[in-house]
Each structure stands twice: as C-alpha cells, then as structure tokens.
C-alpha cells in the first residue's frame, strides 16, 4: 500500500485506529493515493480506478517485509498493484507454504501458475473473460472447484464444489451502498477460512459481512466487527 496527501493520511489513521500494523506502508512523495470514482445509473455501478501511488509499488518493497510472510496465516492480495508485485507475493507465499487469497479486482489476466497455487480467488461475474479468457462461466468454475468464487452486485456468490454448482445470495430490499461489497466478502471469507471452517460456511460468512457493508455508507467505516455477528 502506498500513500501521500490527505486521502492517504486518512486511510493510514483508520488502519492505526483498527490496530493494523502499518510498519511497512511505503509512502510515495511524488504520487497521490490511488482513488476510485463511482458512477451510478439505474441501479448499476461503474468504477473508474486511478491507481496513482499503488502502481509505484515494486517487488523490492515486499522484500523488505519478507520476514512477515513466514508468520502469516494467509496472504491476501488484490490487483490494484503491478502484476510483478502480485507475482512476488505469490513467490513468497509459496516459499513459506502460506495460503494465498486473490481478490481479482480490477480484473487482469493472472498466470496459470498463480491460479493453481492460490487457495481461493474471488472475481466479479462480468470480468471473468478478462481473467480466464472466453470460456463459459460454468466451465471456468468447474476447472477451479472450491477455489473460484464469482460475485455480482446482488450479493450472490457462485462456485463449484467438485460435484455441483453452489449458489448463495443475501439480497435485501435496502442496499444503499454496493461499494466495497467484494472487499468485505473477501475479508469475511478469509477470516472464516483461517478459523478452519468448511468452504460453504466461509462463503456464507463472506456474504454476511458483505451484506453489513451494503447496508451502511462508507466502504471502510461500514465494515463490521466480529462482535456484530451471532457466532
């Protein structure tokens, strides 16, 4: 993660307030913090991403934090950074035999080597062709059983469990904020997986976390706490 300017300071303060270790946040003095601009029409969202400082991240910055890979329960990455940094993340995860989760957003082509190693991949339904090519959704899901989880704006998640297609949906009438739902699902899924839950339960919990975010304003401030759930 890279930061500079008021947005970056705000993000950093929020992480510190939530007791997140920011010791390896690298500040770029020449670029602003990455932003995303959202347009909404007829219930559909379109996102314009401006990576800015995120795309200044380099593999050497991960090398400075390599020792923390060995103590991680799971390594989670998105595609808001250069692909060579994603590849370095994979290399360290494999080196230390760590679970690797990928939220494939913004969508980009990912090497087969990384896809095969990943513990799970979360992708948007309308971006599968960018990541996997022009095969049908069903064929792609069957190729990655219990690994690929496909999401849409209705807070539904589809995956193949090796025997059949599975479908989970939490879609109330009131979802004022659809921004951050994918991040929330991925976070909830990751937490459940690290606690040893079965895949189906990980999906259900990810959906529940995503729903909490959708019912509030603010992709970060809307994120729930574990105490918000009856476990």
Segments the model singles out, each with a brief description of its role:
Residues 8, 34, 86, 186-187:
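A general structural signal for well-ordered alpha-helical segments in protein cores
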Residues 1-73, 229-231:
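Conserved N-terminal subdomain of the carbohydrate kinase-like
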Residues 48, 131, 213:
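Residues that scaffold the ATP/ADP-binding catalytic core of kinase and kinase-like folds
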Residues 109, 137-231:
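Conserved phosphate-binding/catalytic region of the ribokinase-like
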Residues 74-139, 155-157:
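Conserved beta-alpha-beta core of the PfkB/ribokinase-like small-molecule kinase fold
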Residues 16, 94, 142:
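Anion (oxyanion) recognition and catalysis
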């Amino acid at each position: 993660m890279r930061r500079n300017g008021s947005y970056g300071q705000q993000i950093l303060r929020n992480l510190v307030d939530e007791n997140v270790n920011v010791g390896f946040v690298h500040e770029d003095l020449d670029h602003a913090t990455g932003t995303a601009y959202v347009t909404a029409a007829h219930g559909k969202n379109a996102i314009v991403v401006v990576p800015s400082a995120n795309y200044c991240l380099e593999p050497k910055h991960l090398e400075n934090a390599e020792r923390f890979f060995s103590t991680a329960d799971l390594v989670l990455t998105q595609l808001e950074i250069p692909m060579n940094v994603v590849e370095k993340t994979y290399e360290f995860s494999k080196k230390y035999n760590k679970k690797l989760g990928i939220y494939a957003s913004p969508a980009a082509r990912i090497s087969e080597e990384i896809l095969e190693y990943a513990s799970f991949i979360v992708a948007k339904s309308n971006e599968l062709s960018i990541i996997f090519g022009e095969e049908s959704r069903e064929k792609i899901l069957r190729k990655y059983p219990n690994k690929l989880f496909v999401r849409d704006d209705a807070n539904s998640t589809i995956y193949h469990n090796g025997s059949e297609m599975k479908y989970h949906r939490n879609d109330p009438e009131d979802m004022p904020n659809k921004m951050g739902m994918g991040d929330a699902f991925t976070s909830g899924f990751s937490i459940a997986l690290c606690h040893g839950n079965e895949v189906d339960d990980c999906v259900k919990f990810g959906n529940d976390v995503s729903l909490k975010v959708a019912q509030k304003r603010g992709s970060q401030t809307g994120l729930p706490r574990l105490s918000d759930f009856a476990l």
